[in-house]
Amino acid sequence: MNNPLVVCALKDEFGIKGLNYDVLYTGVGKVNAAIQLTEYLLKKGRPEYIVNYGTAGSKKVKVGSLVDCTKFVQRDMDVSGLGFKKYETPFEDGISKKIDFSAFENNPLNHLLTCATGDSFITTIGGHVGDVVDMESYALAKVCLKFDISFIAFKYISDSADEDASIDWVENLKKGQKLFKKTVLEVWNLF
């Protein structure tokens, strides 16, 4: 596990310096994440595996927890009016509505949670699938699936996806960085 690529939306979410591998900052949202990761892979080649780190909201997981996500869905994909299942992208061969990387080796946490990704910062959770919500992971997982690269996401639960979510998110950024460094990077000898 010597050649990872760590992918984050924002420098504010990661901010760990002195690493001997690449960290890619994609910007916020599914489109930015997919474009930036694909561009990186085409220019720099394949890393051994890709680790997404970032913050997430959850009603199911306690704020302040670091969790791993190995299953990913698009929470804002809804073409049910045309007879498709909710969260399923129409006319895609071989990709189910849920992308599953549960077989990722050397996972230090093994919660194997589902991350529901969409292009909105959630301040209320209602009717969404998944254990946690974010804005990039599904897109990153889909690129990894297409390029046949192992993928895992670690999410620091920064907020409860409620009316205080934006305040909680800012206050919890540094706590998440420290926990990710200790729980994942140091365990994998990547720091």
What does each model-found stretch correspond to?
Residues 1-5:
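Extreme N-terminal starter segment of soluble prokaryotic enzymes
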Residues 7-11:
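Structural motif
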Residues 12-191:
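Glycine-rich phosphate- or other oxyanion-binding loops that anchor nucleotides, phosphorylated ligands
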